[in-house]
Amino acid sequence: MVKAVAVLRGSAGVSGVVTLEQASEQDPTTITYEIAGNDPNAERGFHIHEFGDVTNGCVSAGPHFNPFKKTHGAPQDENRHVGDLGNIKTDAQGVAKGVITDSLVKLIGPTSVVGRSVVVHAGTDDLGKGGNEESLKTGNAGPRPACGVIGLTN
């Protein structure tokens, strides 16, 4: 079992912890998250970005992690970035908690996400269905109030 964690921080009061676990390269990865400080009762874009660089805030994280050169999509779509995790839903206090199981996100192997970044966006991800070029790249999910680098843990 390989385990990783990303501690999300940013300048907008959004923060949280994301843990990832994968038993083997063939198995799906379980992603557990608890993120506070978002708007209440909202959906926010949630992605893994290419770089583990947060030196200039979350902008330094680069684009969505996309080793297979696909367009942006929903987590269940065949055509999607590896980093496309869809939206997280917040409760009345602005806290999002949940578990995602994803077969494209890997901690083991050549497309591992270890060392990359998890980013929470300020807007809702349109899942590539927005009908414009930006939708096919980012889902029009907007600014990046919080991010964290994915690192191995025990």
From Swiss-Prot:
GO terms for biological process: cell redox homeostasis; cellular response to oxidative stress; copper ion transport; fungal-type cell wall organization; intracellular copper ion homeostasis; intracellular zinc ion homeostasis; negative regulation of cellular respiration; positive regulation of transcription by RNA polymerase II. It comes from Candida glabrata (strain ATCC 2001 / BCRC 20586 / JCM 3761 / NBRC 0622 / NRRL Y-65 / CBS 138) (Yeast). The lineage of its organism: Eukaryota, Fungi, Dikarya, Ascomycota, Saccharomycotina. Belongs to the Cu-Zn superoxide dismutase family. This is Superoxide dismutase [Cu-Zn]. It comes from the Eukaryota. Disulfide bonds join C58-C147. Binds 1 copper ion per subunit. Binds 1 zinc ion per subunit. Keywords: Antioxidant, Copper, Cytoplasm, Disulfide bond, Metal-binding, Oxidoreductase, Zinc. Destroys radicals which are normally produced within the cells and which are toxic to biological systems. Substrate binds at R144. The gene is SOD1. Zn(2+) binds at H64, H72, H81, D84.
